[in-house]
Amino acid sequence: MSVTVVLNPSGHSFVVEEGETVLESALRSGLAPEYGCANGTCGECKARVVSGEVKEIRFHDYVIGEAEKRMGYTLLCCATALRDTQFEAMEAAHPEDIPMQKVRARVHALKRIGDDLAILEIKIQRGRILRFLAGQHVQLTLKGLAPKKLPVASCHCDAVNLQFHLGRDTDDSFSEHVFGALKTSDKLDVEGPWGLFTLQTNSQRPIVYFAYGTAFAPIKSIIEHAINLELCQPMHLYWCVPENNPPYMHDYCRSLTDALDNFSYHTLTVDVASSDVNARKIAADHPAIADYDCYVAGPDHFVSSASRVFLDCGLPEDQLFEYRERNP
C-alpha cells in the first residue's frame, strides 16, 4: 500500500511505498529534504508531523526529547507514513543550503570505453552519505595523487552510489591512474559539493540541454533529477561529440526518448572550436528560445561560444546555466 506525503512549507508531495522510510521516498522522488547521516544518528532530518500517522521502522541513536515527541517530531530516515501525512520539514532549495562534507568511498565499478573514456562508479562507506544537488561537482582524492574535481553524473536521489565520466588526459596523474592502475574496491576520499549548475525546479519553461563530450555528466545528473521530479515540460538534449567518436551513452539517451513523451535527443558532430554553428542550429530548432531554460556544459570556449549565440537570440541571462569543465 502506498500513501502520499506532503512536505511543508514547500508543498512538495510524493508517494511512500510500504516499508520505505519517508526520507528514502523523498530522495527517490528527486526532492532534497534536510538530512545528514540517513541512519538515525545525527537528527538533522527531524521533522514535525502536522497531520496523518507515522511509525518508526528503524532504530535510531538520536534521542528525541519527550517535549518534541508530544509536538509530533520524528526522524524522516527512520519513520514511514501509515496514511496520507503532512510534515513540517526543511528542504535544500539552493546549492548554498548543502554543507561541505568529506567522506570515504571505494571503487564499485570501472568501465573503460576504448582508450580515452571511462565511467567510474563509487560507493560511499557504510553508514555515510554525500549530500549534493544534481549537476554539482565534487573532489576525488586517491592516495598519493593530486585531487581531481569532477561533476557527479548521477542524481542526488542516490547519495551512496555516485557515477563519474572521465576523458583521458596524459598530463593528469589522476586520469592516468584511472586508465592504468585503478581497480575495484580501491579506496578514495570524496569532498564537496561545489557548483551552482543545478536544475531550476520551480521553472515550468521548456528546457534545452547542450553538452560537449564528457561534460554530458552533469547534464545527465540534471536530466535524472527532472525525471524523478516528473517534470512535464519539453526537454531537448543536444550532445556534441568529436568526429568519429559516437556518444558513449547513446543507448541510454535513446532509452529516455523511448520512455518519455516530453524528451528528445539529438547528436551533433562538431569540433569544440566551432560550437557556435550547432548553437545556431539549436536556436533555429527553437525560435522561441527566449522562453526556454538552457543548460550548457563543456570546455570553456565551447560554453562561451554557445552561450553568446543563445543570448544573441534573445535568451535572458537568468535562463542560461553554464558548467565549464575544470582543468586538473
Where do the protein language model's features map onto the residues?
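N-terminal pre-ligand scaffold of iron-sulfur
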Residues: M1-P33
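Residue-level "contact hotspot" at macromolecular interaction interfaces
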Residues: V15, G36, T80, R131, ...
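Iron-sulfur (Fe-S) cluster-binding segments and ferredoxin-like electron-carrier domains
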Residues: S25-E34, E44-A93
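Short, charged beta-turn/beta-strand-edge "cap" motif at the junction between a beta-strand
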Residues: A93, G144-A146, G192-F197
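Ferredoxin-reductase
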Residues: P99-K187, V241-E243, V270-D271
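FNR/FR-type flavoprotein reductase catalytic core
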Residues: A159-V160, L166-P328
